[in-house]
Amino acid sequence: HLILQGKGGVGKSMIAALIAQYQLTKGKRPLCLDTDPVNASFQAYKGLPVTRLNILQDEEIDPRSFDQLVELISHAKGDVVIDNGASSFVPLSAYLITNQVSAVLQDMGHQIMVHTVITGGQAQSDTLHGFTQLVKQFPSDVSFVVWLNPYWGPIERDGKPFEQMKAYTVHKDRISAMIRLPDLKKETFGRDLSDM
């Protein structure tokens, strides 16, 4: 479970935490990795067994450090949940695509599932563009889980929901699941979620 989106602050770490928590409730012990070199948000969730993977070398992202990531995945017996920060989005995506990591991992018995976020509000265009670019760049055997996060506003354009937007209609065959995060009242549960 690879959480990828080039836009920061859209809920990637929260989604990684939700996936990890779900796995734990099913009695599984996922390998949880935080590759964000700036904010270790996933690792900050207490109670989750998250390991932070240092991908910086002399304050620059070292693409070769992703070899260690693939090595960890290759030895994993169960699910792997990887939170990737906006600052390392481009280098990690380039590494995965250039080195055909999905094919390598599939040969080892693993399946890559890319989770991405579409958000409402000001970042909506950026997240839609990010999703479209991911789908175009990753091989066709990689499927996507799209998380719709209304925290910053409704996910609609010109009165149309995501399912009627071009980003969805053109690429719907690559989407294996769509998860709608609830639009919680800001005064109650929304505040709790935001504090997390």
Residue ranges and their predicted role:
Residues L2, A16, T25-F89, Y95:
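Nucleotide-state-sensitive switch-loop elements of NTP-binding domains
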Residues L2-L4, V81, V114-I118:
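Short glycine-rich or small-residue beta-strand-to-loop segments that form or flank ligand, phosphate
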Residues Q5, A17, Q106-G109:
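Amphipathic, alpha-helical segments enriched in basic
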Residues G8-G9:
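Walker A (P-loop) phosphate-binding loop of P-loop NTPases
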Residues K12:
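Conserved lysine of the Walker
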Residues S88-D183, E187-R191:
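Conserved catalytic-core segment of NTP-binding enzymes
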Residues M196:
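C-terminal boundary of histidine-terminating zinc-finger modules
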